[in-house]
Amino acid sequence: MDVIDFRHKTLSRMVRFTAALDRLLKSLPPSLAKNRLQDQLGRSGSSVGANYAESGAAESAKDFIHKLSIALKEAEETDFWLSCLCVEHPEVAEAESLHRENHEFVKILQKSISTAKRNLR
């Protein structure tokens, strides 16, 4: 698989992840804690794919790395909030599946940043 195919497939996965996360958050029972969790997780979870997409229009190699780094930070934050969701709502099976998928995004972003930095030298 070439870089463009990999990027397209990863972005498609991120779009599906964001849609699934949105559906999950809307299905949670109402509570004050849910509102905070829903807000934080919704923001960070959707930001991963948005920043990854934006990296495709980077103006330089350094800008590309910067945008991927932002996506990684958001993926790490999403990991935290998904962990909270799994603890607060262990009955929600979809949360664990999304947690695993997000962890894959963390690994992809870490490797992409590492490769881009190596190619920058």
Residue locations for each model-derived region?
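Amphipathic alpha-helical assembly/interaction segments
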Residues: 1-121
